[in-house]
Amino acid sequence: MSAKAVAAAVALSFGISAEAQNSTSSPYSMYGLGIYSPKEDVAAAGLGHSGIALAPSEWLNISNPAGISKLDSLSFYFNVNLKGFYSHEESGYESASVYSGNIDGISLGFRGRKWLSFAIGYAPFTSVGYKIYQEKTITGSGEKYKVEYSGSGGLSQAYFDAAFTLFKHWSIGGNFSVLWGTIERLEVNYFSSANGGEDIYNKTKYQANNIYWEVGTQFDFNIGKNNFRFGATYAPEMWLHTSYDQTIYNNVSRELESDDSTPFRFHVPRMYGVGLTYQRNKVLGTIECKIAEWSKVEDNKFRYTANFRDTYTVSGGIQYSPGSPDKPFYARMRYRIGYTYGRNYVDLYNCNLIEKGLTLGITVPIGRSLNAITIAYEHQKRGTQSAGLVEERISSFKIGFNVREIWFMKHKFE
């Protein structure tokens, strides 16, 4: 792919990303900032969303800022990731199905020096997308009317990663991100269906932004012919500059009330994780644990409030590589399988909202070049039908277009 083609793809992708926010249909996204989206490449998604202890030379590992330290010094890397999903949601009373898709991230990177690598990109940070109906009764008359709750939007991040190789087996990395986004929540009371009255719309638009940073490290060591890599990441508690505009109007577009809030702060929790990778010959295995201290975050500024719990996620995966990049087509394919298990941060009726999923992945090379297409599939279960809550079963696909071009080779002329 030529430099002009890469530049065009970057411009097109950033144009798409401005509209790509609804990466979920979960009713649990109505609380706080929505469903958290890990910053990762499609290859890591196929390994159960595990990337803290990975440092590949074939693709950009953005799960750990130190994970780009092993990039090829002659190559330029560029990735565009897309996502599509189908979600079936079921409670004890009814069920619904939703499908959607959008862009899931853009990244590019290169190795500037023997000891220094860079990556920049765009990725979703949180996603909001839900539509819920409820039936209520008018006090006194006993007439019933329908209420609709819906929301959309989320936060995005534009990031810059740098990885430093301090010694042969030890690297550190830093991530600097700008977070921004809009979350819209709408509540509609359909009084016209009960007594012919006016439908009342209550619309709230939240806007949030600030900087965000994360650090990471990786350390390689060998035991005989077995290769190991330890990885760790840490992101401190941050806060977002947040404000909202609220408008109440009826079904004839007549504004009844409006309110502009005083800016307030919403905290993003402290997050940290550790991972370990084992590799011997053609097989790689990785396992990791991530924790986020959501219990210290107060959610009293949003319309729909909930208690938050600390989250934990344990995940791992196995990759099989038949051959090296200079081998025939079939030998350059990569096969992955993974599993993830964790707890959502929303606490409703003292129920643990467990999230677990099985992942599969494959990388298919394009011709004789270093470019490839990476695909990851996940079947995930989130939530429970206990206490009148919703259980979600989600099938999602991610596809990544991985461009790796030799840009920095010096040619000799006679």
Go through the PLM ranges and name each one.
Residues 1-7:
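Bacterial N-terminal signal peptides that target proteins for export
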Residues 15-17:
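N-terminal signal peptide c-region/cleavage motif recognized by signal peptidases
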Residues 7-8, 27:
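Short helix-onset patch at the extreme N-terminus, typifying the N->h transition
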